Each structure stands twice: as structure tokens, then as C-alpha cells.
């Protein structure tokens, strides 16, 4: 079998989109499964829209996901001389031509076709003219001379055979008036020079496939195997947008998802291995094949994403979870070694209530005794409506405890409840709000044991401060 070579070729015009990350993943897995190569190419021919920041976002996103590429990164912006050389070769062979038609004239023809309700294909008057007719005052483009007769067949692994008549393919521009290559030319020259054997990309590129094959044929290049995968849709079945969660990979990292989890989730968006839901990267490399790709669009499902992420979180040991949680908290707060030890001790009770690292960090804030308390709106309402005399009893009773472990604290609260003819929850509700700033949290008794008497009493006494404006 020919050595498999795939590529991921994003345009650096923004963040690494979640759909693009899936495309990169599929190319990476197919190459690794076949002991092939996975290359990265930056398609930055659009100078106005391409940015260095976007390039860095692509690099960091791929590295974070663990999709490490082979060899040096290819930048199209550094290869324009090669594209011009290739276009001139086609000119010399009569497979391309100089076109001097102004854009205004083409726009006029397009408007007329629209008015006549006809499909517009630009037919250049310069297609068969020679140098003696060339105007001196107009800079030309170089166009591909697509054969008038015949058809082009797209052989797609997933979509099957698609036949496009040549009469429906325009003489596309290869070199612009400023001498720069178009995307259509650059991608063919690059794929050939890089030895790409398989192209795996979104089916939004299917409309370009026939035009690109026409360029392959003009050069006499072998056409790579093509697989056009359905795009990811939102939960409502419509095209994925920001309102659905069409964010960059960096955003998912910031939201507290693990890279292994996100790769697992993206893999299952359009590819399956029986009923397996949890698939490690090593298993994915071993099992991945194009035959198991789905033909229907997948829907972005955050509930499923969270479920998979929680599984991967629970696979981490206590030290790793603590380290990752503290790393997030340190973005906004100073964390002492004492507080790190509190979080580590509490981690077993935090992880069972968390689906993401952000969830963990939010709960772990309870243990930052040197930072100001943060109260949810619900917690503030509970505190405003609570019986302050009851809280005073709690403070007095807890102050007398010699042992401050969870059993002793729990027993003391039960005694207070019985003494006041209350249910335990009637007391714990305002106590939880004061100690954690939340109305739902890990066990207050476990929190009390971890933080100790002094910190717990300090938080309970805050109810007497007049400047809180609860």
C-alpha cells in the first residue's frame, strides 16, 4: 500500500473552530492508523484576513489536543513563486490563458444571467486569443482553460461517485492581477508537492472538488483519495453557529474540558466503533477507518460532552485534579499552600459533583479562606431570611467543641435541631449559605472538618457585619 499522507490545511482568519478540530483529528488518526504522515499547512493566501494571532491559535489548539504534526509547517504565503511557475507551465502548454476582462464587465454579465434566471458561467473572450491582441494598459489574470466537452467524476469514499459536466465548470482564476496565486491553484500545487494521498475535509468543500480535479488533470497529477465528511450541526439540526457552541478549541479549554475528553467527543461526532462511547487516543488510532464514518450530520450535544468529560476527570488521580483546579483558581486569586492542602483533602467530595475543571474550581473556591467570600443570589436570600438567633446558637455550640471532625459537628447540629424542634435541614440551609456562599455544595460537615473551627466560625459570624448589604 502507498504510504499514507494526510494534511490539515486551515486558513488563519480566526480561532481553531471545533469543526476544524474534528477534521484535524480525523486526518491525524487516519495517518497514524496507517503508519503514515500527518502534515500541517497554513493557507494564508488571503493577506487581508490572515493574522499571526490566528496562526498561533491553530498551533496551540492542535498541540493542546495532542494532534502533533510531522515535519515543518507549510505556509502558502512563502510559496507564491512556485505557484506562478506552475501557472506559467500551464500557459506554455495551452492549458491556461491570460484574461483581460475587467471585473466590472464580469459583474455585469453575472447580473444579466441572474435577471434571465440562468446559471452563470463566465466565458472569456480571451480564451483563444494570442499575444498580438493583448491590451497594454490592463493587468491580466491567468485562467485555467477547462475543456468544453466531457465531465469530471469525483470519487468520494463517503459520498460515492459524483459526475459534473465540464460545461458547468468555469475557467477559474489561477493567478490574480497582482501576481498572487488563488486558493484553487495553491492547494493543488501544495498537495502534489507534499505527496498528499488522502484528503479528508468537510462536505462544504465538495462544491470545490470538481474544479480542483480539473486543475489536477491539467497538470497531469494523480488525484488524491477524497472523503468529504458531513458538517457538525447544532442541537436543533441547523448549521452550527456561535449560539450552538461553535467556539474555538481555546474556549473549550477555558470552559474546563480535558483535551483527551474533547478528542473522544469529536471522534464520536461522525465516527463509531460499535457501541463504544469512551475511546482513548490509542484505541482511536488502532480502530480508525474511513468506512465507519457516518453520512449524516452530527449534532453538538453539551450533555454528552459533559458526560464524557466527567468520565475522564474521574480517571485522574487526586494530585492531578488538585493541580489542574489550583491552576485555574490562580488565574484570579492568590492561593496559599494551606489552601492547596484544603482543596486536595476535599477533592473526593468535589469531583463527584463536577463535570468540568471549571465546576471543580467553582466548588474549590469554598476552601480559599484568605479570599473574600462570594455569595450567590440564592444564598443571599437565604441569609436575609434566616433566624439570626439560631445562627448565634450554632456559633456558641460549635465554639465549645473540642473535637471538630465531621461526626462531632454533625452530632452537634442534630442536638441544636432537636433542642429547637426543627428539622436538621432548617438549620443547615442558612449555615450552608454562610459557610459556602451557595445553596448546594458538598457536605457542610466535611467542609467543617477540612477548614477547621476558626475558619467556620469566622464565616458564620459574618452575618453580623452590617456592610454586607445582604
UniProtKB/Swiss-Prot annotation:
Sequence motif: 'HIGH' region, positions: 10-20
EC number: 6.1.1.17
Pfam family, one: tRNA-synt_1c
Binding residue positions for ATP: 242
Highest rank taxon of the organism: Bacteria
Catalyzed reaction equations: tRNA(Glu) + L-glutamate + ATP = L-glutamyl-tRNA(Glu) + AMP + diphosphate
InterPro entries given in the database record: aa-tRNA-synth_I_cd-bd, aa-tRNA-synth_I_codon-bd_sub2, aa_tRNA-synth_I_cd-bd_sf, Glu-tRNA-ligase_bac/mito, Glu/Gln-tRNA-synth, Glu/Gln-tRNA-synth_Ib_cat-dom, GluQ/Sye, GluRS_core
GO cellular component: cytosol
Annotated keywords: Aminoacyl-tRNA synthetase, ATP-binding, Cytoplasm, Ligase, Nucleotide-binding, Protein biosynthesis
Subcellular location: Cytoplasm
A Gene Ontology biological process term: glutamyl-tRNA aminoacylation
Function: Catalyzes the attachment of glutamate to tRNA(Glu) in a two-step reaction: glutamate is first activated by ATP to form Glu-AMP and then transferred to the acceptor end of tRNA(Glu).
UniProt similarity note: Belongs to the class-I aminoacyl-tRNA synthetase family. Glutamate--tRNA ligase type 1 subfamily.
NCBIfam families: gltX_bact
Name of this protein: Glutamate--tRNA ligase 2
Organism from which the protein derives: Rickettsia prowazekii (strain Madrid E)
Lineage: Bacteria, Pseudomonadati, Pseudomonadota, Alphaproteobacteria, Rickettsiales
